[in-house]
Amino acid sequence: EILAPFLKDDGKLTLAQFRHNDGSLKEERSIFWARVSERLMQRLTEQSDYFGEVANIELDPPLLSPPQHEQFDMVLTFRNAHIWNESGHLYGTLQSIFQALKPGGVLGMVEHRSARLSDISSSAVEGYLDEAYVIAAAERAGFQLLQSSEINANPKDTKDYPKGVYALPPTLAMGLTDRDYYLAIGESDRMTLKFTKPARAAAD
């Protein structure tokens, strides 16, 4: 709703969609996200006057399909890294993104931030990721950190809830239990990171 109209007349937006369900998906979570992608693609078609021409590729972590080689000036990802990490594909997905970016291109990342500063990763239960861990994974994939911001920080997020980050809005996984408490905290504390693919580097 923001990027598509902004790029409609001067640029091009490509969405990395969840894997299409061709009947082979068995995992409930994958089937759910395939439906989300289908609804989004239908909306883009129905409201093409507003969104313009939006391209679609598939991201089935860690791979983009079709493979992308130095195609993009910028890649943005919002609260996806913990999902990639939980399936063991954080580093591999970052490698695919690195390959897809043009030299000098930018990766922007927003992610739920854990309270720790260490080399540990996230667990599927909590949904948070350690900022140092994310930066290290991106640098290992070839990126250089340009800047970090506290624009999405939330000091009220204590990160110790029974269902992890999913207890907070918008998910509110605890249902009616302590709902007002979680609404008062608001959405999660998040890292906001800006990386670049060095101009001298070329994708393999």
Which residues are covered by each model-predicted region?
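A short acidic, Gly/Pro-enriched loop at the edge of an enzyme's catalytic core
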Residues: S65-V75
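Short alpha-helix
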Residues: M41, G127-S148
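A short beta-strand submotif of the Rossmann-like class I SAM-dependent methyltransferase core
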Residues: M74-N80, E86
